[in-house]
């Protein structure tokens, strides 16, 4: 059984309504921030489910609670660097499960990566270096106590100013 939750693009409505959590399957996959139509879901406690979440569009832009997810992944080219890097965070509880299928390719077997200290293959050095510089900048721009909270607040302030300018002048579309 698959619960498919999507909005009807033809309706022009950007609101997505999720079914009650207790009616969802044991595995939940979702994209937290869909940029084409401007849909961003809040962090949701899916209660005892395996939760796999694409956070590419909002990774490093606001705090995320890692305890709500089983697997988080983000394509670096959105916010963390340049194309060529995918950042993956896996709850260790999933590692033994991932190795049970002989059909899982080594590149998709997170236990293989853990055993190799995350360098199972030659990484895209330039792309990884770009991510390092981005993280260094984030740390430089904020204090140690609440790094992403500060960047999120700053981004919201900038957005408010831009939307106000758009509304007041009608210049931006």
For the regions a language model picked out, list residue spans one by one.
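Conserved hydrophobic/aromatic beta-strand scaffold that supports enzyme active sites
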Residues: 27, 71, 85-89
């Amino acid at each position: 059984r698959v619960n498919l939750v999507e909005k009807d693009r033809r309706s022009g409505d950007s609101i997505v309504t999720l079914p009650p959590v207790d009616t969802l399957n044991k595995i939940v996959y979702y994209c937290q921030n869909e940029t084409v139509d401007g849909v961003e879901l809040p962090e949701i406690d899916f209660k005892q489910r395996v939760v796999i979440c694409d956070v590419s569009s909002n990774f490093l832009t606001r705090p995320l609670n890692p305890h709500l997810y089983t697997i988080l992944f983000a394509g670096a080219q959105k916010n963390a660097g340049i194309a060529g890097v995918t950042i993956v965070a896996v709850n260790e509880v999933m590692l033994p499960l991932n190795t049970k299928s002989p059909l899982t390719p080594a590149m998709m077997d997170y236990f293989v990566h853990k055993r190799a200290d995350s360098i199972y293959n030659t990484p895209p050095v330039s792309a990884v270096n770009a991510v390092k510089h981005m993280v260094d900048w984030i740390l430089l721009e904020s204090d140690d106590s609440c790094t992403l909270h500060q960047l999120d607040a700053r981004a919201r302030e900038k957005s408010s100013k831009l939307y106000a300018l758009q509304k007041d002048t009608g210049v931006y579309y």
